[in-house]
């Protein structure tokens, strides 16, 4: 995992690297959790299911080869700024991608993830996702309850009024990072 301030250079799938690093501690202050595992990832996921009380999981592959003509629209959809009312938990099984999360001062922090990385985004944090120029990621999604993926756009003014958003903002009020 590598995190840094995002600097828009046109193609969302490129690094867009400002060279301003963001530490794991800074991500923790934003309630973003990260772990890496080098062993068998399905066995690791079994342990996570028990450790965190996850009840469901599935796997998704986002690739130009697999999605064909639907690929560009799918990646565009994932890159729209949004939040969820539940945690977003992803274990990267293969390939790589970028999760962008909003900092306390509303800048984009880009997080590069690759095989073996586990990232947990808290409910209520604005974020987006894109593949890299490799155009391939295989991830496991873990859920506390039934699998669901409901994205609430930042352009929808009601997203700021959601309990998940309010709770998230209260949880980071005392945090000072990036």
Swiss-Prot record:
Modification sites for Phosphoserine: 157
Pathway given in the UniProt record: Amino-acid biosynthesis; L-methionine biosynthesis via salvage pathway; L-methionine from S-methyl-5-thio-alpha-D-ribose 1-phosphate: step 5/6
Keywords carried by this UniProt record: Amino-acid biosynthesis, Cytoplasm, Dioxygenase, Iron, Metal-binding, Methionine biosynthesis, Nickel, Nucleus, Oxidoreductase, Phosphoprotein
Protein's recorded name: Acireductone dioxygenase
Entry-linked Pfam families: ARD (PF03079)
Binding site for Fe(2+): 82, 84, 88, 127
Domain of life: Eukaryota
Protein source organism: Schizosaccharomyces pombe (strain 972 / ATCC 24843) (Fission yeast)
Subcellular location: Cytoplasm; Nucleus
Annotated gene: adi1
Cited PANTHER family: ACIREDUCTONE DIOXYGENASE
Catalytic activity entry: 1,2-dihydroxy-5-(methylsulfanyl)pent-1-en-3-one + O2 = 4-methylsulfanyl-2-oxobutanoate + formate + 2 H(+); 1,2-dihydroxy-5-(methylsulfanyl)pent-1-en-3-one + O2 = 3-(methylsulfanyl)propanoate + CO + formate + 2 H(+)
Function: Catalyzes 2 different reactions between oxygen and the acireductone 1,2-dihydroxy-3-keto-5-methylthiopentene (DHK-MTPene) depending upon the metal bound in the active site. Fe-containing acireductone dioxygenase (Fe-ARD) produces formate and 2-keto-4-methylthiobutyrate (KMTB), the alpha-ketoacid precursor of methionine in the methionine recycle pathway. Ni-containing acireductone dioxygenase (Ni-ARD) produces methylthiopropionate, carbon monoxide and formate, and does not lie on the methionine recycle pathway.
One Gene Ontology cellular component: nucleus
Cofactor: Fe(2+); Ni(2+)
Amino acids binding Ni(2+): 82, 84, 88, 127
């Amino acid at each position: 995992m590598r995190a840094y301030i995002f600097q828009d250079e046109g193609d969302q799938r490129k690094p867009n690297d400002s060279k301003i690093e963001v530490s794991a501690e800074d991500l923790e202050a934003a309630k973003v959790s990260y772990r890496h595992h080098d062993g068998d990832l399905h066995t690791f996921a079994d342990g996570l299911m028990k450790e965190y009380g996850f009840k469901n999981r599935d796997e998704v592959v986002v690739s130009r080869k697999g999605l064909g003509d639907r690929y560009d629209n799918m990646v565009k959809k994932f890159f729209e700024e949004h939040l969820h009312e539940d945690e977003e938990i992803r274990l990267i099984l293969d390939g790589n991608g970028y999760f962008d999360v909003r900092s306390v001062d509303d800048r984009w922090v880009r997080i590069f993830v690759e095989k073996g990385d586990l990232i947990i985004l808290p409910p209520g944090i604005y974020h987006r996702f894109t593949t890299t120029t490799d155009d391939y990621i295989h991830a496991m999604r873990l859920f506390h309850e039934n699998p669901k993926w409901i994205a609430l756009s930042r352009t929808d003014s009601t997203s700021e009024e959601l309990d998940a958003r309010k709770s998230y903002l209260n949880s980071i009020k005392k945090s000072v990072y990036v």
